[in-house]
Amino acid sequence: MLEQIKGRLVVSCQALENEPLHSAFIMARMALAAAEGGASGIRANSVADTEAIKQQVALPVIGLIKRDDPGSEVFITPTLREVEELVAAAPEMIALDATQRPRPGGETLAQLVAGIRARWPALLLMADIASVEEAVIAEQLGFDCVGTTLYGYTAQTKGHTLPESDFALLKAVLAAVAIPVIAEGNVDTPERAARCLALGAHAVVVGGAITRPQQITRRFTDAIRSPAV
């Protein structure tokens, strides 16, 4: 899969339960539209969406399950349970929260990865990280690639976005690890996506700027309310 998406665009087709497009059918059609637009892969949330998308398109899928736990801030494929559920849907790669935040049940990231490798040694794993340190740890633990997915979404990185300072975090991660680095998070224009690849990102994931009409509409309405002088 990593070779298939190299130097190309992956589209994140996700809609949570509180969003208007929440539907496996709709996400599968969104994936079809992304494929027609030239996407090289899809990032999908939930078993139902992953299965529906794989029936609709031939593109490789990065699967994940977002599941909240009252005792932890980690919610992207947080435990072995979610991995087991996803394996049945057969995504080409599974994404996990690889931040250093406390995990559900007190399990460590190292323990989770060891458990995954013991059962599915050939499974491709993507580490969703928020810092350079987390990227380095993910590489040491044997992840196949890292994504900048959670930069700006942890307590330590709140208020930051990936594009700031000409993608400083992306540059730092690229310099720190040898495994593929996937740029993801607030990559909301074609120019920013191209910049990520020019800097050396293995691939770039774009989500809301393509697949969340409410966010796209908000950008227009905000601009109309505050026109440039």
PLM feature segments, named:
Residues M1-A88, L125, E133-C145, R225:
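Conserved N-terminal beta1-alpha1 strand-loop-helix module at the mouth
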Residues M1-L2, G7-A28, P163-V229:
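C-terminal alpha-helical cap/extension of soluble enzyme domains
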Residues L9, Q14-E17, A35-E36, R67-D68, ...:
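A short, structure-level motif marking secondary-structure boundaries and short turns
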Residues Q14-L16, I65-P70, A89-R103, C145-K158, ...:
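Glycine-rich phosphate-binding active-site loops on the catalytic face of alpha/beta enzymes
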Residues P20-A24, R43-I62, E73-R81, A98-I116, ...:
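Active-site-adjacent beta->alpha loops and helix N-cap segments on the catalytic face
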Residues G38, V57-V61, A89-M93, R119-A122, ...:
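Glycine-enriched alpha-helix->loop->beta-strand junction motifs that scaffold or abut catalytic
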Residues A44, L125-A127, V181-G185:
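Conserved hydrophobic beta-strand within the GNAT/NAT acetyltransferase core sheet
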Residues A110-Q111, R117-A122, I179, R225-A228:
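P-loop/Walker A phosphate-binding loop and immediately adjacent motor/lid segment at beta-alpha junctions
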